[in-house]
Amino acid sequence: CHNKSVIKLTNSEVSLCEKHFNIYFEKKVRKTIRVYKMVAKQDAIGVAISGGKDSISLLYILNKIFKPSKIKLIAVAIDEGIKGYRDPNFAYVKKFCKKLKIQLKICSFKKEFGNTLDEITKKDKKTIPCTYCGVFRRKLLNEKAIELGATKLATGHNLDDEAQSILMNQLRKNIRASAILGPITGIKDDPSFVRRIKPFYFLTEKEVITFAYINNILDKYVECPNSILGYRRTIQETLNDLENKYPGTKHNIISSFLSVLPLLKKSFESAEIKKCKLCNAPTSKDICQACVLLER
């Protein structure tokens, strides 16, 4: 059409106006959900939400797609207890969920683990906050999803996020962690684990930001002050540099990974899913990583 372009698609020469980009975005999400059979008619979907562009956009588009059906959406937020970080973001999350008439559940590290993340890292100055945060967040999201009756847990991970995770696992020689990745996480179904789905798997970070902006759902998001300390930030910057020099790099990483993912998952299918001896959570070891960290 002749309307003003709002974005030039990555890995393509196509430029789209606001109207046609929204159509493109929704079609891509619907296709990803359909092709990977992410959602069934009887599902209730927990949506991990932080207030950032990815999770807000995810809740917005899933509400649009599933509102006509009987599929229930439940927003789940985690308050890690980082000074000056969550309060302003959660104020918007509450307002946004109320507007969409979606149930919101907020749980905290303080209530569930006895300490905020700030308190934990003061006691253990040798370990970066991201180590605790990632493990505890995953544990809580799974537990709360089960408590709320969710059969799937949707996360806002986009193509950039997945490419970063793939590269991180390769550099750390963590093959099992790679096998758990993909549009639907995990290796096999287990009643103690809610499978995670990634409807934004084939959408770039640039596309998600553009979607949030043109639909006026992007609030002033306070970034986590600890993010600059994490290994992921280094990988993110490296991949962005490669993408700038060699456009299509991130798409190629995803495409190559998906071609070997079925073999990766198959190689770990026979692995036993154990129960943590301390908290009964699903784990590949005798004691889950969350309990290992809590015992420090």
Regions found by a protein language model. Give the residues of each.
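ATP-dependent adenylation/nucleotidyltransferase module used to activate substrates
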Residues: 1-183, 202-215, 288
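Flexible helical/loop "lid" subdomain adjacent to adenine-nucleotide binding pockets
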Residues: 26, 34, 44, 152, ...
